Amino acid sequence: MIEQGTESAIYNVGSENSLFIAVPNSVAYVASKHAVFGLSESLRNDLPDFIHIGTIFPGYVDTPLTGQIEGGMNANEFAEIVKEQIKNKEHIILSHAYNTVHIEKRNHEIALAYEKYAPRYEGDDEYDVGAILSKLQNDKVWRF
């Protein structure tokens, strides 16, 4: 893809479990879905801009895989929602609106932990790994 130099895309399929734990007692599944998001974000950071990288985060969708368990989003409805976002070259592809409740809760918990144990201060970028690596690269000490 890089050698061709033409616009292309990679969309990895994660899950709502990439963002929060929706399915209890599923350690391996949840860990693998978090890894999918990390993979996509790393590729997005490392590859040229003409290669669009995204992650699709489906919630519960009725498919043959779900068998007799009802209550998921209709697969055609899901496809329409996802298709529009891919056409727009979005990198975070979402479908299930209520998941914002879970995301906001998780982000709030993280923000509270930072406020309590690692509050912002003047010059707090001194330990930012991105800034540190950029300086090392500029000083020709580190190459990535």
Show the residue positions of the predicted features.
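Conserved Rossmann-fold SDR core element
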Residues: F37, L47-V61
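Non-catalytic terminal and boundary segments that flank Rossmann-like NAD(P)-dependent oxidoreductase
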Residues: A113-F144
